Curated annotation (Swiss-Prot):
Pfam families named in the record: Terminase_6N
UniProt-recorded name of the protein: SPbeta prophage-derived uncharacterized protein YonF
Annotated organism of origin: Bacillus subtilis (strain 168)
Disulfide-bonded cysteines: none
Coiled-coil ranges (or none): none
InterPro entries tied to this protein: P-loop_NTPase
C-alpha cells in the first residue's frame, strides 16, 4: 500500500549498500534492438513456413489458389517440376518465387537457364514489372538489369538472380537454386554435365557456425518448368523419375495443370479456346501436349519415329516469302539465292472443297543442294490452305514457283490434282500480281504431256500417280531420308522466335506479322505430328501402306513425300551422269 510510511528515497534504499546478486524487476527486459531481431526471427520462420502468405502480406501480390499451392511446394521441396498449359502465367509465377526465395533466405544464389538466353531473361523482366507495383519488393532490390548480356537482380541481403545460356560456355558458375525454364528444349547432357554442376556448396548462414544449430544445414534446389512433350524425349523419363520419387515420400514434387484451370481462374478466355479448337488446321497432338498437359506417345504401329525426324530440325533460317524480307530493316536479314548446282522444287498435295476431313492443299519448297553423294534436301517453306478452286490453286503454285526460283513442280495428278495440272498447262493470268504465266507441261509422263495443247510449253511438271507399289516406295524413301539425315527441316517455333529476335526491327512488328514469320516453323511441327500418327500395314509382298487415324490428315506428309521422291529421281540421274562407262577403255589406264 502506498503511503508516506512506505515511501523511501533512492538515497535511503541503498544506505546499507547494493546487493549486486539481487535481480531487479527489469532483469529479463530486452533492448529494443533485441526485441526487433526476435520479431524478425519469428516472422521469418512464419513466412518460410507459409511463403504464400508472405507474397500476399509483405509483397502485396494476390495469388490464385493453385499459385499459392505451387509457391508452397517450391519452397518446401528440393526438386520441383511444373508442367503448365499456355496461359497459366508460368514465367510470372517463377519470378514471384525467385523474389520470395531471395528475400526469406539471405545470400541465396539463383541461376536461371532456358532453351535460349532470351527466355531466361523474361523472368528478370517480370521482376522489374513486379517491383513497380510492390514498394516492399522495390526496397529489397539493390540493382536490376535486363540487358541481354548482363541480366540480373541483386538484393540488399546478399541474394542475387542471374541468367545463363544453356551451353558448355556456362561452366564454372555457382548457385544454390537452379531453375530451368522450358527444360525440354535444353539438351540433357547440358543439364547433367553443366547446369547441375552449379549446385556445389549449399547456402551457409552464420548460425550454422553455432553448435546448437549445426544440424540445420540446407539443401540446394532444382526447379524444372515446361509444357509436356513426346514420350520418346528424355524429359518424359525425367518426369517419371520425379513422380516415382514423390510417391516414395522424398522431397520431390511434380504436377501438370491443363488449360481448364487457367480458364477457371480467369487467366484464359474460354471463347478464345473454343475458337482455336474449331480452326480447320487444329493440331490435336500439339494441343494435348501444350494445353492439356499430356505427354504424347506414338503407337507401336507408327511408321515414322519422332526421334528420327526431330534430330533433323537444324535449319534456323527457312526461306520466307520474298516480300517478308523488306519488313525487317536489318542488312543481315536477306533472301538466300541459289548455290551452284542447286535445284528447287515446289511439291504439292492438292485438296478440293474446304471443310472436309483429310482435305487440305499443301505446298512445300525443297532446296536440293549438291554433295558428294547426291543432294541434301532442305525443306525451306511450307504453307497449307483448306481446299480451293483448281484455277486459284494453280495460280498460287505459279506464284511460289516464281518467288522461290524453282526448277520443277511436283504434283499429284490424280483426282482434284488433275484439274490443277490442266490449269497449269494453260496460260494463267494472276489478277493479284497483274501478270500472265506461260503454260507448263509434264516432264515424266508422255500421256500427261499430251494433255497440254501448247507444243512449246516448258516441261517442268513431275506427275505423281500413286499406286500401292509407288506409295510404298515413297514412304520407304522418306523414312530412310530422315534416318540418314539427308533431309533437313526448320527448327521449332521457340527457337525460331529467338533466331528472329536477333534482327533489328523484328520486335517492332505487329503480332499478326510475327505470326506469319513463325508459321514457317510451326508448319514443320504440324508435319511431324502428322507423320508420327501414320500407322503401317504390310502386305504379303512386303509393301507398306500408311493409314492415318480417323479425322486426321496426312496432307503435309504427302507433299513432303512426293518432293523427296522426285529428289531421289534427280539424284539417281545425277549419279548416273558421274558414273564411269565400264566399256570405256580409258577406265583401265
Amino acid at each position: 500500500m502506498t503511503s508516506h510510511k512506505n515511501f523511501t528515497t533512492d538515497r535511503n534504499k541503498h544506505s546499507r549498500g547494493i546487493n549486486i546478486f539481487k535481480k531487479g524487476n527489469n532483469f529479463k527486459k530486452k533492448s529494443k534492438s533485441e526485441r526487433l531481431m526476435d520479431g524478425i526471427g519469428a516472422w521469418t520462420s512464419f513466412y518460410r513456413a507459409n511463403p504464400h502468405r508472405f507474397v500476399k502480406e509483405y509483397l502485396g501480390i494476390t495469388l490464385k489458389l493453385f499459385q499459392c499451392i505451387l509457391i508452397y511446394m517450391m519452397v518446401h521441396n528440393h526438386y520441383f517440376m511444373y508442367l503448365a498449359s499456355r496461359g497459366q502465367g508460368k514465367t510470372w509465377l517463377t519470378s514471384v518465387y525467385c523474389c520470395v526465395q531471395a528475400i526469406l533466405f539471405p545470400g541465396t544464389k539463383i541461376v536461371i537457364a532456358s532453351g535460349t538466353k532470351g527466355q531466361a531473361r523474361e523472368v528478370i523482366e517480370k521482376i522489374d514489372d513486379l517491383r513497380k507495383e510492390s514498394p516492399n519488393l522495390r526496397r529489397e532490390i539493390e540493382d536490376l538489369k535486363t540487358s541481354t548480356n548482363d541480366a540480373k537482380v541483386e538484393f540488399h541481403n546478399g541474394s542475387w538472380i542471374k541468367i545463363v545460356a544453356s551451353n558448355d560456355g556456362a561452366r564454372s558458375k555457382r548457385a544454390n537454386l537452379l531453375i530451368v525454364d522450358e527444360f525440354r528444349m535444353v539438351d540433357f547432357e547440358i543439364i547433367s554435365k553443366v547446369l547441375r554442376k552449379f549446385l556445389t556448396a549449399p547456402r551457409s548462414p552464420k548460425y550454422l557456425e553455432k553448435e546448437e544449430y549445426a544440424h540445420l544445414k540446407e539443401r540446394n534446389k532444382e526447379i524444372y518448368l515446361s509444357s509436356c512433350w513426346y514420350k520418346v524425349h528424355w524429359s518424359f523419363n525425367r518426369f517419371i523419375t520425379y513422380y516415382n520419387a514423390m510417391m516414395k515420400g522424398s522431397k520431390y514434387f511434380v504436377c501438370g495443370l491443363p488449360y481448364q484451370i487457367a480458364i477457371k481462374e480467369g487467366l484464359l478466355d474460354k471463347d478464345q479456346v473454343r475458337d482455336e479448337m474449331a480452326e480447320e488446321d487444329f493440331d490435336p497432338i500439339g494441343w494435348s501436349m501444350e494445353m492439356e498437359a499430356l505427354w504424347f506417345g506414338e503407337s507401336e504401329k507408327a511408321y515414322f519415329k519422332f526421334e528420327d525426324i526431330e534430330k533433323n530440325r537444324k535449319l534456323a533460317s527457312p526461306l520466307f516469302p520474298p516480300d517478308y524480307y523488306s519488313l525487317i530493316k536489318d542488312s543481315n536479314f536477306k533472301y538466300e539465292g541459289k548455290k551452284p548446282g542447286e535445284i528447287r522444287l515446289v511439291s504439292n498435295d492438292i485438296a478440293g472443297m474446304a471443310g472436309k476431313d483429310n482435305d487440305a492443299s499443301v505446298y512445300t519448297v525443297f532446296r536440293l543442294i549438291p554433295n558428294s553423294n547426291g543432294y541434301d534436301r532442305h525443306i525451306v517453306y511450307m504453307e497449307s490452305i483448306v481446299g480451293g478452286h483448281t484455277g486459284t490453286q494453280a495460280t498460287r503454285i505459279r506464284q511460289i514457283y516464281e518467288d522461290y526460283d524453282c526448277d520443277y513442280i511436283v504434283l499429284d495428278t490424280q483426282s482434284i490434282g488433275l484439274g490443277v495440272y490442266d490449269a497449269l498447262c494453260q496460260p494463267l493470268y494472276d489478277k493479284e500480281r497483274a501478270k500472265e504465266y506461260e503454260p507448263f507441261s509434264c516432264i515424266n509422263d508422255e500421256r500427261m504431256a499430251a494433255r497440254c495443247t501448247y507444243q512449246n510449253a516448258e516441261k517442268v511438271i513431275y506427275s505423281i500417280k500413286g499406286n500401292a507399289q509407288l506409295n510404298s516406295e515413297i514412304a520407304v524413301l522418306l523414312k530412310d531420308g530422315f534416318k540418314r539425315g539427308k533431309i533437313k527441316i526448320p527448327i521449332n517455333e521457340n527457337e525460331g522466335k529467338e533466331y528472329l529476335k536477333r534482327f533489328k526491327g523484328y520486335e517492332g512488328l505487329s503480332p499478326e506479322v510475327k505470326g506469319k514469320f513463325l508459321s514457317s516453323y510451326a508448319q514443320i511441327t504440324l508435319l511431324i505430328n502428322e507423320m508420327i500418327n501414320l500407322e503401317a500395314e504390310y502386305s504379303d509382298n512386303g509393301q507398306v501402306k500408311l493409314k492415318e487415324p480417323k479425322s486426321k490428315r496426312k496432307d503435309r506428309y504427302s507433299s513432303v513425300a512426293y518432293g523427296n521422291y522426285i529428289a531421289t529421281v534427280l539424284e539417281r540421274q545425277l549419279n548416273k551422269q558421274t558414273e564411269y562407262d565400264v566399256e570405256d577403255e580409258l577406265v583401265y589406264f
